[in-house]
Amino acid sequence: MENFLLEKIINKKLSSDQYSDVVPNGLQIEGEKIIKKIITGVTACQELLDKALSYGANAIIVHHGYFWKNESQCIHNMTRKRLTTILSNNINLYSWHIPLDIHPKLGNNAQIAKKLNIRIKGYILPYLFWGTLEENINAFDFSKKIEKKYEKKPIHIYANAPIYISRIAWCSGRGQNFIKQAYNFGIDAFLTGEISEETMHIAKELGIHFFSIGHHATEKDGIKSLGKWLNNKYDLDVTFIDIHNPA
């Protein structure tokens, strides 16, 4: 498949033109015209680039790419090394950020719901999903379920919160600042990737369960599901590489 055709296909699937983003979505760096082997990952870090080379890939698709707004435009140090690796090896670098967070089937938030058996009911905000569990569940049992599904223990703030959870809101990645909007919507628990210093106090004083799983952990499954879709629909050679990141 040609590189710009792949971009067009994914842009259409993720409805990329509908979203304003803080980073370019699509083919960020043009490489070899014909795509032979694709590596997917969360972030286009140097380790992922090196792994892609070892796999003989000439295309990389990530959730966190390059050229973010308000980022320095100077090409120094690690930025220089990363770009040199990509350009000197004729690699295509693709990135989809917000479109891959909120796609109703492939997106990170949809995948969280799938993993934790949450019925998606709608959106509180464009990036803030809400839904219900199959049945009311003890909050500590739900915490254990998260640990089992994500293979890591979540941070769980529960002071003053109800014992059982029915209505839950969630946002992949850096969503901790949505906790008040989630509370105002009348949910029992809020789940996201990151936690800030003030989040504990807000959750405690509002009497709401707060779960932090990690930015990386909540944003692996979207890029994985996109890769599986490309493999199944277009028979492309796609491999997901998980670069360990506890944050």
From Swiss-Prot:
Classification via InterPro entries: DUF34/NIF3, DUF34/NIF3_sf
GO cellular component, one term: cytoplasm
Taxonomic superkingdom: Bacteria
Pfam families recorded: DUF34_NIF3 (PF01784)
Alphabetic keyword roster: Metal-binding
Residues the record lists as binding a divalent metal cation 2: 64, 215, 219
An example molecular function term from Gene Ontology annotations: metal ion binding
Stored Gene3D superfamilies: NIF3 (NGG1p interacting factor 3)-like
Binding site for a divalent metal cation 1: 63, 101, 219
NCBIfam families attached to this UniProt entry: YbgI_SA1388
Family stated for the protein in its record: Belongs to the GTP cyclohydrolase I type 2/NIF3 family.
Assembly information from the UniProt record: Homohexamer.
Name by which UniProt lists this protein: GTP cyclohydrolase 1 type 2 homolog
Organism: Buchnera aphidicola subsp. Schizaphis graminum (strain Sg)
